[in-house]
């Protein structure tokens, strides 16, 4: 159920099909008889049961269609055993045709709002655009990139949108989002809600013109007022805006060179301040060093997955995916244990790509044995663990509130040599305690996965007394 809830908060269009006891045994106590439809209803866009064999295909199409109606999300469909097993005449079955069971969702909303947004951006001196998960989910990234480049606007990415621009792109910005939002005169938020990751909308400049674009009308203007709200397909909207500006002689692109140069200088300064952490040679290993080494290891075909608390927060500062679709994390729900499932799915969907999942030791323990599942299905991957022998993000808050005596209750995990998991399954495992061995260990894991077809586990022992700044500030609660 946590996986379904993760799909809901991450706006992932996943169709879940579950079983049920025979309808003839309803309420008789049949095997695993539970109200699955009712349980799934609050965490899906659509939850229903099939009551007729003739309707199975039709109901599947309805559930799939709901996954893509408005903002994407999960559906749940229950098929009782006798409904599934019964044979019926094919002429009595409703079978929707592929490609014809749902309408296009590339709506741009009110054309007048497109004109308003185009005018705002053209006149803006210091615009900033944040591209969220929806931009990648609905495959609107090319249109988004076109707008950034066409109008010379700095772009920031969060969630699954990370990687839409390569790190060396002149319109890619990473560390200066807070700076841009404090100084920008126009801020456009595309496909991401004002949730805890965005400070519920409170971190934007108070007098800035704020525009929000989203596929779900319920998300627009939630948690804060905006100057202009557009409901529709992010890619279609951004393309329509760019099309309007092509007829304008001065779209402001040249005027904004100084604005981008200013942000670039701050980016450089902030990166330089982080370098001592990224290059730290401390013992135990600093978690920032691990994230930096992983970033240096990635290539254009590596799908990076973060599964944990602090490891995700820290890696978001260091890891810069090289291509669209190459970043996955627990999403807005923030639940641990997603990594192995994400890695398995990524390997099956993109068998020619390399998959690397960076876990905390707490999250790795939740799904470690499914590495065998990944191997069995031909989807081996590289598992890297930042092991501090604790549920450390939770531990920080507990220590701060209750002190050493009571703060360590339930969050210390012990020293586990997780590399043994890979070895017992026929893959490569290595324990790393020297920061200079991180890179070589990752290379050995890569070579082993390629040559042996089994997942590799690199267990890196990190300092439990180091935390991400967001953890120290407890920003997830503010």
Label every model-predicted segment.
Residues 1-249, 254, 293, 297-300, ...:
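N-terminal alpha/beta PP-like core and its mobile active-site loop of ThDP/TPP-dependent enzymes
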Residues 1-23, 177, 183-186, 191-195, 205, 376-469, 474-477, ...:
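Thiamine diphosphate
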Residues 28-30, 103-116, 285-286, 308-311, ...:
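A general structural motif
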Residues 32, 82-83, 216, 307-312, ...:
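Short glycine-enriched loops at secondary-structure junctions
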Residues 72-76, 248-266, 453-457:
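Flexible, glycine/charged-enriched surface loops at secondary-structure junctions
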Residues 210, 294, 306, 345, ...:
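Hydrophobic, well-ordered secondary-structure elements that form the walls
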Residues 264-347:
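Active-site diphosphate/adenylate-binding microenvironment
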């Amino acid at each position: 159920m946590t996986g379904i809830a993760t799909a809901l908060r991450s706006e992932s269009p996943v169709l879940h099909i579950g079983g049920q006891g025979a309808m003839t045994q309803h309420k008789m106590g049949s095997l695993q008889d539970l109200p699955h439809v009712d349980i799934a209803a609050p965490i899906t866009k659509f939850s229903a049961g099939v009551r007729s064999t003739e309707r199975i295909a039709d109901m599947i199409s309805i559930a799939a269609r709901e996954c893509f109606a408005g903002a994407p999300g999960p559906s749940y469909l229950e098929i009782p055993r006798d409904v599934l097993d019964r044979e019926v005449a094919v002429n009595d079955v409703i079978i929707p045709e592929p490609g014809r069971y749902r309408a296009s969702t590339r709506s741009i909303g009110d054309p007048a709002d497109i004109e308003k947004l185009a005018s705002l951006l053209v006149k803006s001196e210091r615009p900033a655009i944040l591209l969220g998960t929806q931009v990648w989910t609905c495959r609107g990234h090319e249109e988004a990139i076109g707008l950034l480049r066409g109008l010379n606007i700095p772009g920031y990415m969060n969630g699954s949108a990370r990687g839409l621009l390569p790190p060396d792109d002149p319109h890619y910005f990473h560390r200066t989002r807070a700076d841009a939002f404090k100084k920008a005169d126009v801020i456009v938020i595309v496909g991401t809600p004002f949730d805890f990751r965005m400070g519920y909308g409170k971190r934007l400049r108070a007098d800035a013109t704020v525009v929000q674009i989203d596929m779900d009308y319920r998300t627009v203007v939630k948690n804060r007022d905006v100057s202009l709200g557009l409901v529709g397909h992010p890619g279609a909207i951004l393309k329509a805006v760019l099309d309007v500006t092509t007829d304008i002689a001065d779209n402001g692109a040249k005027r904004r060179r100084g604005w981008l140069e200013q942000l670039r200088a701050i980016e450089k300064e902030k990166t330089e301040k982080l370098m001592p952490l990224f290059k730290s040679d401390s013992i135990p290993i600093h978690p920032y060093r691990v994230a930096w080494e992983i970033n240096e290891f990635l290539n254009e075909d590596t799908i990076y997955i973060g599964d944990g608390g602090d490891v995700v927060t820290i890696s978001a500062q260091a890891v810069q995916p090289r291509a669209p679709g190459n970043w996955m994390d627990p999403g807005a729900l923030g639940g641990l244990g997603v990594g192995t499932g994400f890695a398995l799915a990524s390997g099956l969907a993109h068998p020619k790509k390399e998959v690397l999942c960076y876990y905390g030791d707490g999250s790795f323990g939740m799904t470690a044995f499914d590495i065998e599942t990944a191997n069995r299905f031909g989807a081996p991957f590289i598992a890297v663990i930042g092991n501090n022998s604790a549920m450390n993000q939770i531990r920080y808050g507990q220590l701060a509130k209750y002190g050493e005596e009571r703060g360590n209750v339930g969050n210390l995990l012990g020293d586990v040599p997780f590399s043994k998991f890979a070895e017992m399954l026929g893959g490569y495992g290595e324990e790393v305690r020297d920061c200079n061995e991180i890179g070589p260990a990752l290379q050995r894991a890569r070579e082993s996965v390629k040559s042996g077809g089994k997942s590799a586990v690199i267990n890196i022992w990190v300092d439990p007394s180091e935390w991400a700044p967001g953890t120290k500030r407890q920003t997830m609660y503010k």
